[in-house]
A protein has these predicted regions:
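Outer-membrane beta-barrel initiation region
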Residues: 12-202, 278-283
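Short, small-residue-biased leader/transition segments that mark boundaries at the very start
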Residues: 3-10
Length: 293
């Protein structure tokens, strides 16, 4: 934050005046239009603001007419950074007038959007003591600021393949190939997404996070089984203070089903009941709560 024209009037305290936000596109597009809503004027490029005004306004912890506070300034900057959609954001303060007794500062925020997409491709090679080896890959793609809500929509696709490097006693290694395929989708918000919560409770000075996730995977273990798994979670994280953290998972579902088993696998699990239960068909709904201090 910086004070413009501070040489005009020096005071021990100031009040907040008008707030203007200038949003520059990730390609450098300068603002060409503006919209006025309570407490703020938003300048943007294109047909509509790059972020919904209501989402942005909840990150400002001061109002017009309030006494300027460094703490509110810090909370505001931290909340904007947690959105994860800006390459940078800066605040400038300027006296509302040039009179010697001026006690009001207008606020200007300049921000540039970050790139909307993040992508990652990872390769690996696995070698096991069971004489199986093979490659694997993970591809991840994230869309930031999804639907102008500062949410992140993510997609991940992973796969691996392993083959037997040595033949078995019967000289056949062609049937010993294992593979795994999986995909997941997640939608994450930097706030609590609860329709019954008041706007005041949702506008927190400390981090809040909501996550929705769906996943599915296909696992084939050579000479043993083929398993299909899928499930999903809904999770909330929030901090009422800097040191207290709550994690609430009201919904978690995991479903596993064996699509195919071999005689060898059936013989092994028949002798080990706990293994049979852990690898059998399962439908597991759950919920959890974690408190961190």
């Amino acid at each position: 934050a910086s004070l413009v024209g501070s040489e005009m009037c020096i005071r021990d305290s100031y009040y907040i005046g008008n707030t203007s936000v200038y949003l520059t596109g990730y390609k450098g597009e300068e603002p060409t239009d503006s919209i006025v809503f309570p407490g703020m004027t938003l300048h943007y490029s294109g047909k509509k603001p790059g972020i919904r005004p209501g989402v942005l306004a909840k990150r400002f912890f001061y109002q017009k007419g309030q006494l300027y506070s460094q703490a509110r300034q810090n909370f505001t900057q931290e909340a904007l950074a947690r959105l994860g959609i800006f390459k940078f954001a800066e605040f400038r303060y300027a006296p509302q007038d040039t009179l010697p007794g001026c006690d009001t500062l207008n606020v200007r925020m300049n921000a540039t959007f970050d790139l909307p997409y993040d992508g990652e491709l990872e390769f690996n090679v696995t070698t096991k003591s069971t004489d199986q080896t093979g490659p694997g890959a993970i591809f991840s793609l994230s869309r930031k600021n999804f639907m102008r809500t500062a949410a992140t929509l993510s997609f991940q696709l992973k796969g691996s393949y392993e083959w037997q490097t040595n033949s078995t006693a019967d000289g056949n290694s062609s049937k010993l190939n294992s593979y795994e395929l999986g995909t997941s989708f997640s939608l994450e918000y930097p706030r609590l997404v609860l329709p019954w919560m008041s706007k005041k409770m949702m506008s927190s000075r400390f981090p809040q996070h909501t996550s929705f996730k769906l996943y599915a995977s296909q696992l084939n273990r050579a000479r043993f089984f083929k398993m299909l798994s899928f499930g999903g979670t809904v999770s909330y994280d929030f901090q009422p203070s800097r040191v207290w953290k709550h994690t609430v998972t009201p919904f978690r579902l995991a479903f596993n089903t064996l699509q195919h088993t071999t005689t060898r696998f059936d013989t092994i699990v028949d002798k080990n009941r706990s293994l049979k239960i852990s690898l059998g068909n399962q439908f597991i709904p759950a919920m959890s709560y974690t408190f961190t201090l």
